[in-house]
């Protein structure tokens, strides 16, 4: 299949679901769900996205974050379109059962809607603060700038809405009164209809990366959702207590042994994020096409039913 540029843009913005990938959670037939794309189309899109994002350097992305000017770069236009799409669909979508609606915004940032709640995980976007009036709470896995937005966190605090993070203070916004997750000790709490278990995982094997990331294991009725941030080590810390997740949101790079990780978690399905993080240089935190395909292959061999979360995708 050879997609034209016009067909490519149409495919990422409005592709109808073609087949259910998940066991235990069916894809919404009206959703542009990454989990429901054919492998052939996903493969084409990976190549196209890789090509389009390579032209955006961290410096260009940084200027866009300051002034909002996309400067004609397709990837930055796509980032704006993705945000508009997610905001519109989050307002319009009604969730009736336990299966939440989950959208990919950018990087490891997601919006989740349940019957009673709307919340974010690692939301990072130039306009993230404009979602605050809609959200009930927000989760942040760790204090790297590609996983949280300062203006968004300030706005959540000013709106007196819960911001759950692994750090109570940070040099970028000391005044934020976030809920601190204590040390490496797991914590379990409930916000509205979402029960949340936090546990520390290692971002890297080096000293700075030990216990650096807080993972979130969530119960939404009978649905199990897992977000592990930038977990980079598949050791005994990486484990679930509430059963195999219906959906695992993960970053398949850093130093993570994908095969070992999937054997430990055994998700019913998963979505790869953090693949085209424009603040990183290509191959230095920004995944290459080779890394993405290798991760997908390793996850598939481990029975993980992997899919790529493109910006703006509705995953569930």
Label each PLM-derived region with a short phrase.
Residues 107-109, 186, 211-215:
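Short hydrophobic/aromatic beta-strand or adjacent loop that forms the aromatic wall/cage
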Residues 175-194, 210, 263-316:
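Binuclear metal-ion centers of metallo-dependent hydrolases, dominated by the metallo-beta-lactamase
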Residues 124-125, 202-265:
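Active-site-proximal loop/helix segments of hydrolase catalytic cores
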Residues 2, 7-105, 111-130, 135-137, ...:
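Metallo-beta-lactamase
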Residues 132-133, 153-160, 240-243, 261-266:
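Short, conserved loop/helix-junction motifs that constitute active-site signature segments
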Residues 127-128, 144-148, 170-172, 189, ...:
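Active-site environment of divalent metal-dependent phosphoester hydrolases
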